[in-house]
Amino acid sequence: MAAKEVKFGDSARKKMLVGVNVLADAVKATLGPKGRNVILEKSFGAPTITKDGVSVAKEIELEDRFENMGAQLVKDVASRANDDAGDGTTTATVLAQSIVNEGLKAVAAGMNPMDLKRGIDKATIAVVAELKKLSAPCTDTKAIAQVGTISANSDNSIGDIIAEAMEKVGKEGVITVEEGSGLENELSVVEGMQFDRGYLSPYFVNKPDTMVAELEGALILLVDKKISNIREMLPVLEAVAKAGRPLLIVAEDVEGEALATLVVNNMRGIVKVAAVKAPGFGDRRKAMLQDIAVLTGGTVISEEIGLSLESTTLEHLGSAKRVTLSKENTIIVDGAGNDGDIQARIAQIRAQVAETSSDYDREKLQERLAKLSGGVAVIKVGAGSEVEMKEKKARVEDALHATRAAVEEGVVPGGGVALIRALNAIINLKGDNADQDVGIAVLRRAVEAPLRQIAANSGDEPSVVVNEVKNGKGNFGYNAATGEYGDMIEMGILDPTKVTRSALQAASSIGGLILTTEAAVADAPKKDGAAGGGMPDMGGMGGMGGMM
């Protein structure tokens, strides 16, 4: 086992503090509408330029192991805020830096670190409760656009396109972000249920100009097995032909004579039909077939529940207003499923999302949710260069997380104002002893830090701005973009309550842990002499040629 180096008490905390400050100083430069860029070197390719706090934090590793511990702990603050609310990473870092710096001064002055932490925790609970009181619901498109704009570093086009996407697919709908091919951001919306399986034969195509098969008022047969024998399908095909409606077959696979017969029937116009493989694999395929069944009001024909193809009737078939099949995708629009059944299915999938611990499973479940709840919106990010594309895409993703958080828990006035107003909750708060009171004072100072940093990044005097905002009431705050004071909500400067809350909770949690650290253990640096022990002998090997 490698030798370890151990530092205790003040010397351990001082080293960690250096790391905390190095990382926080790099990250906090990006805060606010006039935040600066940070340039990140890459081991290959062009450097990346970003104003995204968590991207900066992730890149930082320090040479000194003890300093690096402090930096990594603050990086964890940014990651926690990002995981919980998807944004607020820079605010969380600024709060953590203030808590650690002010707290360590108190520890050096002889305060009990455990009581300091208790005071900080007590004050955090009070501030979070006050933030919830200040929170206003975020339901209208304008407010959603404003939240997106602020999170995307005051880029109106991003806020507007996210609000438009939410309007089209609903608050629960899935919105994905992709790299576009143009200079402008684009929004495309796929209505209905889309899955990534195309027609099994090009002979099903009935729109040769666009190479798609379109079925109007289609009946839908869902089968949880391979179909290779046409005989077992004859009863249902005859019933569909009598009904005079087109048929979509979704099965594990359709092959051999079954596929050939379907193609011939389609080309002769006996039955207008198209076949497609069921999406997904294994258990996920069964679940997605069931989703389609609920959406279209049909039943999955499966031997597991005692249904066979031979006994299938029109009652077992689902239906939809329109089905469009291309080479790669199938879209089912306006399924005839019962609304109550669809909502029950959505609730069931939501419960599974809450229970799963796998990110992959969660993503797949959310995709299924979107398909059931009415569509998928794709934001294609436009940019002039690859470097700009990466930076812009990260901002769009941040803004999307922020708007989701706003819809979930509401909004508070932005620009650090909500935390200043929440100070009211801890002005007269008392701890159980004098040291806890100091912990409360540490947090009182920390909640001013985001506003101070926004003002500093804008080239203004932080103390003047903080005093001016403190003297105001309600939504009164400082618009750093224009240098004006006024009502933050009216000026469209909003922060999601969840983002502000998560930032504060993550910062006070990690800040408290650093303050109560009494020993730090790291790998001891390797001595240079140890690695070079065998080198002198190598010189002797060069003479071997002369010996021969």
From Swiss-Prot:
Its main location: cytoplasm. Keywords: ATP-binding, Chaperone, Cytoplasm, Isomerase, Nucleotide-binding. One of its GO terms (biological process) is protein refolding. Gene3D superfamilies: GroEL, GroEL-like equatorial domain, TCP-1-like chaperonin intermediate domain. The keyword Isomerase applies. Its EC number is 5.6.1.7. It is found in: Cytoplasm. It is an enzyme of class 5 (isomerase). InterPro entries: Chaperonin_Cpn60_CS (IPR018370), Cpn60/GroEL (IPR001844), Cpn60/GroEL/TCP-1 (IPR002423), GroEL-like_apical_dom_sf (IPR027409), GROEL-like_equatorial_sf (IPR027413), TCP-1-like_intermed_sf (IPR027410). Pfam families: Cpn60_TCP1. It comes from the Bacteria. ATP binds at residues 30-33, 51, 87-91, 415, 479-481, 495. GO terms for cellular component: cytoplasm. Disulfide bonds: none annotated. It catalyses: ATP + H2O + a folded polypeptide = ADP + phosphate + an unfolded polypeptide. Belongs to the chaperonin (HSP60) family. PANTHER family: 60 KDA HEAT SHOCK PROTEIN, MITOCHONDRIAL. Forms a cylinder of 14 subunits composed of two heptameric rings stacked back-to-back. Interacts with the co-chaperonin GroES. Together with its co-chaperonin GroES, plays an essential role in assisting protein folding. The GroEL-GroES system forms a nano-cage that allows encapsulation of the non-native substrate proteins and provides a physical environment optimized to promote and accelerate protein folding. This is Chaperonin GroEL. It comes from Pseudomonas fluorescens (strain Pf0-1).
